[in-house]
Amino acid sequence: MRLVTIIAAADGSALGNPGPAGWGWYVSEECWAVGGWAHATNNMAELTAVLDLLQQTAHLTDDLLVYCDSTYVINSITKWMPGWKRRGWRKGDGKAVLNVEIMKALDEAMRGRRVRFEWVKGHSGHVLNEAADRLANAAAASWKDDTVPSPGPGFAGAVVRHPESRPGQVVDEPDLFSA
């Protein structure tokens, strides 16, 4: 039996943070996806890029290696999530976990999967990360211009698209940035 690992990069961008935001993941020129919102944070975008990648590869049994320049994403999934779950999705200080709906979806998407995350320094020339960064920035720029970006080809055979990346769908998160 041959073992295969899907190698991808995921990234997010927010112009103004919060502001127009985009996310993107990249495997190859034929296999990538983007999405975003008119108003969100970079962390929401970073998390959603990974979530969409996990959902679009859920029908496969292959291992997944995700390059990511966000330590927040990597630590959330690999270190902090078990404690948050034990505490009812609360942090150690008792405060609610931010982006909890995305975190819960990530927890579900990770279940039974063999996924490894590797941190890469952003804007350091890592080919896959640079491609994901370009996609995320282009998606955020589209939202800034009030246009919905083309979602990209996605992963062959994927049956799920992340619904929160569609216009008007992200309403569950509190507005932490208004006065």
What are the residue ranges of the model-derived segments?
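RNase H catalytic domain
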Residues: 7-9, 13-20, 51-131
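Acidic, His- and aromatic-enriched active-site or binding-groove loops in soluble protein domains
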Residues: 137-152
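Alpha-helical transmembrane segments that form the membrane-embedded catalytic/substrate-binding core
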Residues: 46, 132-137
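A short, charged, Gly/Pro-tolerant segment at domain boundaries
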Residues: 150-162
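RNase H-like nuclease fold core
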Residues: 1-48, 55-58, 62, 141-142, ...
